[in-house]
Amino acid sequence: MSPAFNASPNQLTLALSKGRIFTETLPLLEAAGIRVTEDPETSRKLILPTSDPAVRVVIVRASDVPTYVQYGAADFGVAGKDVLMENGMAGLYAPIDLNIARCRMSVAVPAGFDYANAVRQGARLAVATKYVQTAREHFAKKGVHVDLIKLYGSMELGPLVGLSDAIVDLVSTGSTLRANNLVEVEEIVQISSRLVVNQAALKLKRERLAPILDAFERASAALA
């Protein structure tokens, strides 16, 4: 690892992704007395300082948060349950459901498509998703025959252009589905974001981490 990236032994590094998770994590940080001093939406920096000189924030892709924490490039991070389900929890400790960035992972199909009948008839369905592992496990448990198509974005486009019969994606309000003439037919799992901690950091930096974890737990309990 580059020496320029390495934190001092007493410094804590928190991995966050831009967007909703970052925004909804800010009040939890403030509950721990920590304020991020730059906005990742306007700053070009990927390592952001905070009001606590011993804590810094690294901005990474949502799907990369567990990797940074697992390998110790970050001591702790915030990741969606969807990411953790898809990528596994090796080397991670996930002590707290933060009750933020809540949504659900669901199966959606074009309006008018009889999904239940297709399943009953044993039809083989093409399903577009970025959650291939999670979708595979879900459909296998239900005995549904599927061909999974890995996409990285714009899942709703799949059925519109004939790429897939259905999609598996995250749904919050459902407005994007409706705008693309899709309907939610099956909920797979409720999603929220979790605090994940590097197992080695939990042992070696427990004294520094414990007050922050306690503050996160208290603040997130109020959101439940």
Swiss-Prot record:
Record's GO cellular component terms:
cytoplasm
Keywords carried by this UniProt record? Amino-acid biosynthesis, ATP-binding, Cytoplasm, Glycosyltransferase, Histidine biosynthesis, Nucleotide-binding, Transferase
On the tree of life, the source organism's domain of life is Bacteria
Reaction catalysis annotation: 1-(5-phospho-beta-D-ribosyl)-ATP + diphosphate = 5-phospho-alpha-D-ribose 1-diphosphate + ATP
Q: Which GO terms describe its molecular function?
A: ATP binding; ATP phosphoribosyltransferase activity
Q: What are its GO biological-process terms?
A: L-histidine biosynthetic process
Q: Signal peptide location in the record? A: none
PROSITE patterns xref list: ATP_P_PHORIBOSYLTR
Check the record and name the CDD domains matching this protein.
Answer: PBP2_HisGs
Q: Which InterPro entries match?
A: ATP_PRibTrfase_cat (IPR013820), ATP_PRibTrfase_CS (IPR018198), ATP_PRibTrfase_HisG (IPR001348), ATP_PRibTrfase_HisG_short (IPR024893)
Among Pfam families, the record links this protein to: HisG (PF01634)
What Gene3D superfamilies does the record tag this protein with? Periplasmic binding protein-like II (3.40.190.10)
Could you say which EC number(s) this protein's record lists?
2.4.2.17
UniProt cross-references to SUPFAM superfamilies, sorted A to Z: Periplasmic binding protein-like II (SSF53850)
Tell me the compartments it is located in.
Cytoplasm
Q: Quick one: which pathway?
A: Amino-acid biosynthesis; L-histidine biosynthesis; L-histidine from 5-phospho-alpha-D-ribose 1-diphosphate: step 1/9
Q: Which PANTHER family match?
A: ATP PHOSPHORIBOSYLTRANSFERASE (PTHR21403:SF8), ATP PHOSPHORIBOSYLTRANSFERASE ATP-PRTASE (PTHR21403)
Q: Which family does it belong to?
A: Belongs to the ATP phosphoribosyltransferase family. Short subfamily.
Q: How does it assemble?
A: Heteromultimer composed of HisG and HisZ subunits.
Q: Which HAMAP family match?
A: HisG_Short
Q: What does this protein do?
A: Catalyzes the condensation of ATP and 5-phosphoribose 1-diphosphate to form N'-(5'-phosphoribosyl)-ATP (PR-ATP). Has a crucial role in the pathway because the rate of histidine biosynthesis seems to be controlled primarily by regulation of HisG enzymatic activity.
Give the domain section of the comments: Lacks the C-terminal regulatory region which is replaced by HisZ.
Put simply, this protein is called ATP phosphoribosyltransferase
Question: Where does this protein come from, organism-wise?
Answer: Cupriavidus taiwanensis (strain DSM 17343 / BCRC 17206 / CCUG 44338 / CIP 107171 / LMG 19424 / R1) (Ralstonia taiwanensis (strain LMG 19424))
